[in-house]
């Protein structure tokens, strides 16, 4: 079934501030912070810098987007620096397509470790 954007696979992640509250949704529903994978920030999500709240957001987005906890854990710190740390303060959106493009760039630039066992 297509989502509200007309694409079955396309998700839309959105972050905004309402007063002091930070709201992050995926296709209009609250994003699960995934504290079960790693609890960086018990106070929740943040963005626009490279701290613990942005790490929690990066992990939550990738876990939801990828549907693979191991892949999310492998990439979320790099995703945090590449995307989350650069998001504007008041409001932002990221689509599945944009996330896929970023993940591909991160894979392409990851150094190959030869002889590591």
Region annotations inferred by a language model:
Residues 2-9, 13:
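Long, low-hydrophobicity ectodomains and other hydrophilic envelope-associated domains
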Residues 15-19:
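Short, ordered beta-strand-loop transition motifs
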Residues 67-108:
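Short, compact, well-ordered microdomains
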Residues 1, 111-117:
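Short intrinsically disordered terminal tails
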